[in-house]
UniProtKB/Swiss-Prot annotation:
Pfam families: Arginosuc_syn_C (PF20979), Arginosuc_synth (PF00764). Pathway: Amino-acid biosynthesis; L-arginine biosynthesis; L-arginine from L-ornithine and carbamoyl phosphate: step 2/3. The gene is argG. Belongs to the argininosuccinate synthase family. Type 1 subfamily. It is found in: Cytoplasm. PROSITE patterns: ARGININOSUCCIN_SYN_1, ARGININOSUCCIN_SYN_2. HAMAP family: Arg_succ_synth_type1 (MF_00005). ATP binds at A11, Y12, S13, G14, G15, L16, D17, T18, S19, A38, G119. GO terms for cellular component: cytoplasm. One of its GO terms (molecular function) is ATP binding. This is Argininosuccinate synthase. Keywords: Amino-acid biosynthesis, Arginine biosynthesis, ATP-binding, Cytoplasm, Ligase, Nucleotide-binding. GO terms for biological process: argininosuccinate metabolic process; L-arginine biosynthetic process; urea cycle.
Amino acid sequence: MGKDIKKVVLAYSGGLDTSVILKWLVETYQCEVVAFSADIGQGEELEPVRGKAEASGACAVYIDDLREEFVKDYVFPAFRANAIYEGQYLLGTSLARPLISKRQMEIAKLEGADAVSHGATGKGNDQVRFELSYLAIDPAIKIIAPWREWDLNSRTKLMAYAEKHGIPVPTTQAKPYSSDRNLLHISFEGGVLEDPWAPPEEDMFVMSVSPQQAPDQPEEVLIQFEQGNPVAVNGEKLSPANLLAKLNELGGKHGVGRMDIVENRFVGMKSRGVYETPGGTILRIAHMNMETLTMDREVAHLRDSLIPKYAELVYNGFWFSPEMKLLQTTIDATQENVCGEVLLELYKGNCRVLGRRSDKSLYRMDFATFEEDEVYRQKDAEGFIRLNSLRLRIQSMMNK
């Protein structure tokens, strides 16, 4: 494949791995390399990445702010679905990969590149997510996955390669785990976390304080929804990215959104991950409670049956699949009346609902009251119960 490659677009973070990959691509394939970095809320300045990429041999560098697109077109659709993988994981990394891939492919087209490359290892989910997205957009694109080709399979070897080729290397000691951050969450895995019995050290966490160290006074938060999407916090209208950032700030202050789980990777193995998702945790609780007030029972139950499949598709990298499009269209049709406000309380790692209200509410006090009412004839319940018990009574008679 090497002789056929003239130009490659690399998903570039500026870290040791992708800096080595950039130089390795130039040397191994004798090609031009375009470095692409996406700002999806990592919480760090990306402009220095430009100089590092150029120093490592990049012929061009793209640094794109994708935060609003990430939240509006990837996070919010998933939260309209209440998506959660294996009952615990809010899909922070999974949702970012298709956006990065899409923009990477757009740059490849702009640059006339014939290949794309990424820094995902051959053991993880990200290689699948990146490459399924690439191929869904352009089946003819060539893909270079260095971790499946080279023998630089340790940090020591990467450092030696970097020093040999004059690549800027980290001056700080490597952390005993890997992390990945965006506006929705930060994940930690590997290293000391590979032992599922070993608790994470408190100094690892960056988006949230320890619940024990959180304020002793609870804080109320009001979230407004329109058609399933959050649009305001405490009465202030905010853009999607700014709204999620605000909820991250509030949730992190109160120690909300920490999760330590063992999950099933698409490639077949189990892995342990520790996550901080403060804003996402608040948002999911609020959205689900907004739905309880405004969504028809049978629609809600049918939609809920689709959540595991939706989450599995996102987790496994099928964001651009036809079945994903079908599910999203179906789910979005359920959100038309999910409008109103939810009041929550944040306190020492907990997020609980205090109240909810909506002009689209299906909750009627005159029907639900335990006091005397004139709109519900309680005697009607007798026939309802008798008809619904018919098959049970027949079964009982057969067993005698």
